Amino acid sequence: MTPSRTPSPWMLPVICTAAFLVIAQAFMMAPLIPRLAQVFHTNVGWVGLAVPAYLLPYGIATLVWGPLSDRFGRKPVIFGSLVLFIALTAATASATSVAALVAWRFATGIGASGVVPISLTLIGDVVPFQKRGRALGWLFGSIAGGTAAGATVGALVEPLVGWQGLFLAVSAFTAILGVAAVLMRAVPSLPRSAAPPLAAVVRGYASLLSLARGRRTYAYVAINAVVQSGVYTWLALYLRQRFGLGEVGIGLALLGYGIPGLLFGPTIGRLADRHGRSWIIPAGVALTGVCALLLAAPLPLVAVQAAIVALSLGYDLTQPLLAGIVTDLPGNRGQATAVMAFLLFTGFGLGSLLFQLALTWGFVTALILFGAGALVAAGVAVSMFRDERPHQTVPMLTPAA
């Protein structure tokens, strides 16, 4: 797909800010779990379901938004999803029970799921692969920053404005961003693809999964998401139980997550563009595993905070680079990105659920299980991604025998 005009210099700042707000709102729930359990007079297990209730439908709905963006264009889908996100985020503040909260989170997950993945597809449309790493570094740095800011702001600001005020504020800020994006014409209008029949859409997904390069990349998108989300979602409860921290202490402890992505995301992307992804991806998965194991150890709070920062860096070394590979797969880019977003966000949701199940044996056991699994995956990744050299994609495009 070729752009009809040169993209606005505001395109990347706008879509990165939108991604920041969408993800901040998603992970704003994590530190609020203990507080909302008190508000709704229930246990943390029930309130904790609000996290996967958002992430799982988010991931599933991306399979629909991708083909829709191919048919109707990236710009209408991004703005349409943004409007749904604004409305449903505001509506979440009306919840008076945990059941209503979970229901609103479910609906918001569906509505919001067109913003980030279609923005990623848009980058793939207008930025050549040789320069895509830096742009994706900014986007995923914004996602990591949103994860950190959501958790931190949720913990620090909730005592001041209430949990309802948090959702209303995110909705208002996103509405302002949407109006500014329209006025600045930040999102380019690209030529629409011919609308494929349903059978062609199904064949497109099957074709992507027939590629060895596609299968291994998608597998590590899912693995990375499960480990990162599983550990991160429950850090607020971990910090409360282990160190007795309140909302402010939890917010400050989580503040470091996302900082590496904001500071080093574009630099990591440039390294990938220049030197390839063959060693960076396994290193990121390994770092994630090491951080999970460190959190299981009896470390002081300052060391735990350092491990949380390093956990974020593990994400920054993996997901943006995996996304770069996905946007280079042959075939329909909207569908390729939709599969990645589906696995990424369903992985986030499943990671939260699986870690919650592992918590029946305690935090130490759960962290060891997740950390050991990540280290095994890192070892396998060394051989799986050995051919991801800079700008050499042709040998990887043939289906596996």
Regions found by a protein language model. Give the residues of each.
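Conserved MFS/SLC helix-loop-helix module at the cytosolic interface between two early adjacent transmembrane helices
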Residues: 60-96
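Helix-to-loop junctions at the C-terminal end of transmembrane segments
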Residues: 62-73, 264-276, 359
